[in-house]
Amino acid sequence: VEECALVLNPIVKEITLHFENRRDYTIIGWFICGLGAIFYSYEYLLRIAPSVMEHALREHFNLSATGFGLLSSIYYFAYVPMQLPVGVLLDRYGPRRLLTIACLICVVGTFMFTAATVFWIAAAGRFLVGFGSAFAFVGVLKLATIWLPENRLAMVSGMTSALGPIGAMLGDNFMEIFVERLGWIKTMNLTALFGVGLTFILWFGIHDKKGQHRQSGTVSSFKKGMIDLGIIIRSKQIWVNGMYGCLVYLPTTVFAELWGIPYLKHAHGLSAQAAGLANSLLFLGFIIGAPLMGYISDKLFRRKFPMLIGAAGAAIVMMMILYLPGLSESNIQSLMFLLGLLYSAQAIVFAVGRELSPGEAAGTAMAVTNMIVMLGAMFLQPLVGHLLDFSLSAHLGSAAVTGATIDNLQRLYTVDDYQFALSIIPLGILIAAILTFFLKETHAHAPK
């Protein structure tokens, strides 16, 4: 490690000085933000991994749908509350050291998860992964506020939001193949080894400073950061904005990240690979739509209008996916892609959160917004599993469900069971559309 540092540090410093002397930070800024975004994609891959290996995990740990939903959502029991200190810590200490340590924690958690033979050890591993992942998204946004132009904040947040689902697409399309050939344990161990290399890359590649000065987003006093946190978390507009983001993001946090592939396999009869492809098309739609929505919002100097249109359209498409009978595979793929395009308006909430808050608390504002956004996954992933089990028990009887094996349980779920459990998604998106009428229009300007 010391030898690598001796070789790499002078190179990185020379490149940085070259750009500093030219006062042209844009290229190196994109490079640094790109490294952070790779970590965000990596943690996203770890986040959605249980959906790809649902059958293997339920069999290995003997889990009901409720238990499987709980195992996945434990990630968020660390991720969500950590958003409160993450913003303050990033403002205080900078992204470089925190993103590096966070990536290492994700690696340790993944190895713990694969070594587990009982539920609570696996849950502890998922908790650690969630803890480390909590720094990724907001860390990239913090780097963007340091290195990239402020007048393109919505587009930058959209592009950042889009980069995470790239990890999900890799998981849906390639992890399934590795799981079938190597098993879930070896697959996750390989993923953890990649994280070891990424940890070193983050340490040597990321810089917290632009030129010789910290940006105004960096707070010198931890006490000041806590005061800012208190102001932000008491803001009604921050909560309205965050709840919009939470509800319109349910197609990702509840559907695509966990229950989408099982639903498409059981309700529409798709193969594992076809369901993975359809699921990845939702992420592809989001990847394309998030920066596009941000760009349109920046150009119009309006936040609420694209947020309203995106939510209303996403609710309609989600209902079509859930309730239209006889959809062909190509129909499902097209609808999933369209759904991703529409609900990508969610990415705008991070620009709004920044614009509703003072500049020196940029990291804190975006972290609080991200915390609220992720509340949906924390509570609704296990709720969908519970509703599935409840619906199954209602028409089969609890005794039959209790005595069934995991294999039999998965075959016993009906389309009605899934529709009942997943109905919370279109309902939530419709509520998000209504919330836009209570949100202040910032006109793409942060307070002075």
Where do the PLM segments sit?
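Juxtamembrane intracellular "pre-TM" segments in multi-pass secondary transporters
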Residues: 18-25, 209-242
